[in-house]
Structures are given as structure tokens and as C-alpha cells.
Amino acid sequence: MEKFITLKDTVVPLDAENVDTDQIIPARFLKATDKEGFGENLFRDWRFDKNGDPIEDFVLNQDKYSGSILLAGNNFGCGSSREHAAWAIKAYGFKAVVSSYFADIFKGNALNNGLLPVQVCPEFLTKLFVAIEKDQNEKISIDLEAQKIKIESSGESESFDIDSYKKTCLINGYDDIDFLTSKLEAIKKFEQKRRGKENVPQETI
């Protein structure tokens, strides 16, 4: 997984609440096995009409908005527990999603796939939307080590919470297996010490 330490970029504002996983990636596109291929169908039914033509007023189809940070309304990622929703957002090119609340399962799936969910208070979320509406080139910075998100032009910032284990994994670019592998030497030493006390022959370790 790619390391995530800091990120400063422009923002794509999706001003909609209760965005569920079927809206993020419709069920008919879940048969694919390549994670990278899901990006093309992100918000498929909002991005394209029944003829496959782009819906011009949808935010992902507007050239004035770009960037690797998705700004979303409250209760993002609700609905079914499909991991494909996180895959689609990540495959499209987003590295972080900012909202005032995330569904728990979506939040876990996002973190497991290297996508950072940044949960802020409703008041700060409103400030973010206002800043982007005022200037679509506004940049937002996210410092994972400091657990801070900041509006660059005004300097206004807010802290956000993240599980310490998931934070370590993101900063180091680890998935669960990578994290375990990184601890093998410490595990081996612990087992050697433990087995030594129990008089277990070293060659069995």
C-alpha cells in the first residue's frame, strides 16, 4: 500500500448527505475482480445517464473541480457493507474522504485499503464547503501524523481521530500482513525468550 503521511491538494465537493454504497458503486458492477477497474464506475448512476452520456452538472464531470480529496456530506458510506465502495473511490484517484460522519463498516474498509476517512465536526465541514464554493482552487492539507486538517487560505484547522493501529499502517504503507511481517523479529525474540524459560530446544523455534 502507498504510504500516507501528509496530503495537500484541491478538493472535489460532493454536497450530498446519506450517500450509500450502492450510489458509490452500483451492485451491477461488483462482479469485477480487479480493484483498479472500479474507478470508472464510481457514482456511475450520478455521473452518466441511461445512454451512457455524462451528466454535466454532476461534480465529477465538472472540469473546475479536481484533486485527490473528496469532500462529502454527513453519513457517508451508509448502506450495505461492500468493500468495493472503498475500492472504487481509491481507484478513481482519491486518497482521502472528508465528512462529518462515516458508516462504521465503510470507515473500516477505507482504512484497510489505504483510503483515509477524515471525520470532522459539522461546523468545520460547512467551513470546508464554503471555502471550496468561494474558490474551487482552494487547497486543503491533511497531516496524518499530527491528525490535523487545515484550510490553507484561512489557516483554520481541526483535529481528527483515527485508530492508532490503522494510523501506523497508513503512515508506513502497511496492510495487516505487512504489519505482522514488520514485527517478525520481535516475535521471534519473544518466543526465544519464552521457550528458553520453558527449556524448549532452540532448534524448534
From Swiss-Prot:
Biochemical pathway: Amino-acid biosynthesis; L-leucine biosynthesis; L-leucine from 3-methyl-2-oxobutanoate: step 2/4
E.C. code: 4.2.1.33
Pfam family membership, one: Aconitase_C
GO molecular function, one term: 3-isopropylmalate dehydratase activity
Keyword terms, alphabetized: Amino-acid biosynthesis, Branched-chain amino acid biosynthesis, Leucine biosynthesis, Lyase
Enzyme class: lyase
Subunit structure: Heterodimer of LeuC and LeuD.
Membership in a protein family: Belongs to the LeuD family. LeuD type 1 subfamily.
Name of the protein described by the UniProt record: 3-isopropylmalate dehydratase small subunit
Source organism of the structure: Christiangramia forsetii (strain DSM 17595 / CGMCC 1.15422 / KT0803)
Organism taxonomic ancestry: Bacteria, Pseudomonadati, Bacteroidota, Flavobacteriia, Flavobacteriales
